[in-house]
Amino acid sequence: MRFRPLHDRVVVKRVESEQKTAGGIIIPDTAKEKPQEGEIIAVGSGARDESGKLIALDVKVGDRVLFGKWSGTEVKIDGVEYLIMKESDIMGVLEASSAAKAA
């Protein structure tokens, strides 16, 4: 099944965080918090301004984004958990450095 969000909504798949701390301590599942980082899976067509003109979204499919702890609505599509949120719930886009892109 394909899901297409409406207006200024986006579908985000959470990106799992590291299982270990920088010091090498393994974090058990019970102590983990849900990650606040994800990848954009689908985007809506955009919002409309007062005159009815369509305003495109700043994020696109494939972007890695940061969002608030309580942002979005959790849904399960084809057995996979996603978040549906408005673009305004996204705090920013993570951009890979040029060295990481080359590798």
UniProtKB/Swiss-Prot annotation:
GO biological process, one term: chaperone cofactor-dependent protein refolding
Domain of life of the native organism: Bacteria
UniProt-listed SUPFAM superfamilies: GroES-like
GO MF annotations in UniProt: ATP binding; metal ion binding; protein folding chaperone; protein-folding chaperone binding; unfolded protein binding
InterPro entries in the record: Chaperonin_GroES, Chaperonin_GroES_sf, Chaprnonin_Cpn10_CS, GroES-like_sf
Pfam families: Cpn10
Keywords from the named record: Chaperone, Cytoplasm
Protein's cellular compartments: Cytoplasm
Main location: cytoplasm
One term under GO cellular component: cytoplasm
Role, per record: Together with the chaperonin GroEL, plays an essential role in assisting protein folding. The GroEL-GroES system forms a nano-cage that allows encapsulation of the non-native substrate proteins and provides a physical environment optimized to promote and accelerate protein folding. GroES binds to the apical surface of the GroEL ring, thereby capping the opening of the GroEL channel.
Protein family membership: Belongs to the GroES chaperonin family.
HAMAP family to which the protein is assigned, alphabetical: CH10
NCBIfam families (UniProt xref): PRK00364.1-2, PRK00364.1-5, PRK00364.2-2, PRK00364.2-4, PRK00364.2-5
Protein name listed in UniProt: Co-chaperonin GroES
Organism for this UniProt entry: Rhodospirillum centenum (strain ATCC 51521 / SW)
Gene behind the chain: groES
